[in-house]
């Protein structure tokens, strides 16, 4: 029963997010009404509106992230560096496509949530590096890459002005990913250079 109410609240919040142009304008009362639950139930299960929205956006992101997550299962003949690159491009493309929801999630992840976004990247980085790096180095690399991309997305307007181009434009986004990967994996820069601007 408890799980049902929690799921009911989460599902109602996802529906409100899909219908809303401004996720931050959604109130706890809106969510309670849509879920047909008492207001206190939201605080009981989620402790705050921010935590609920974070979980709802995460659920929404997971539903919409099929392409991104499926990259991990692609043909193992493809070099892990290229699979990692494709995964990052899919992730960033999804973030741009669903920016009205993702901006909130990025802010929450960068400032308050547990560090979980990197968990999907660690196995690929481990494959890329083999035994050349320690586990700590692999985890720091994963965090640096993901948090840098999150920050670029979160401050897209300012970073676009700083770099002199629109960072949300697909080709420029790929260029940024290739640049970040070249910094972290210089041994593959020329071998798998895809972006002509590098």
For each predicted feature, which ranges?
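Amphipathic alpha-helical segments used for helix-helix packing
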Residues: 89-112, 118, 156-158
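C-terminal peripheral helix-coil segments that are non-catalytic and often amphipathic
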Residues: 122-132, 154-198
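Amphipathic alpha-helical interaction segments
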Residues: 8, 30, 86, 90, ...
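Helix-turn-helix
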Residues: 8, 16-51, 55
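Amphipathic alpha-helical packing segments from all-alpha helical-bundle domains
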Residues: 65-68, 106-140, 174-178
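Short, leucine-enriched amphipathic alpha-helices that occur as contiguous helical runs
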Residues: 2, 6-14
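Short, basic, alpha-helical segments at the C-terminal edge of helix-turn-helix-like DNA-binding modules
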Residues: 28, 58-65, 71
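Hydrophobic alpha-helical connector segments
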Residues: 69-101, 135, 142
């Amino acid at each position: 029963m408890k799980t049902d109410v929690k799921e009911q609240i989460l599902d109602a919040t996802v529906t409100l997010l899909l219908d809303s142009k401004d996720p931050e304008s959604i109130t706890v009362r809106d969510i309670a009404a849509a879920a047909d639950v008492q207001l206190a139930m939201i605080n009981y299960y989620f402790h705050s509106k921010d935590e609920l929205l974070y979980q709802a956006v995460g659920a929404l992101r997971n539903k919409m992230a099929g392409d991104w997550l499926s990259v991990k299962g692609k043909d193992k003949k493809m070099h892990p560096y290229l699979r990692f690159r494709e995964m990052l491009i899919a992730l960033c493309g999804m973030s741009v496509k669903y920016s009205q929801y993702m901006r909130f999630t990025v802010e929450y992840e960068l400032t308050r949530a547990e560090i979980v976004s990197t968990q999907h990247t660690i196995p690929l980085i481990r494959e890329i590096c083999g035994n050349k790096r320690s586990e700590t180095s692999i985890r720091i690399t994963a965090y640096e890459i993901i948090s840098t991309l999150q920050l670029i997305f979160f401050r897209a307007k300012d970073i676009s002005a700083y770099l002199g181009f629109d960072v949300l434009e697909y080709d420029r986004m790929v260029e940024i990913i290739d640049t970040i990967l070249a910094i972290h994996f210089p041994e593959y820069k020329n071998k798998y250079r895809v972006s002509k601007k590098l």
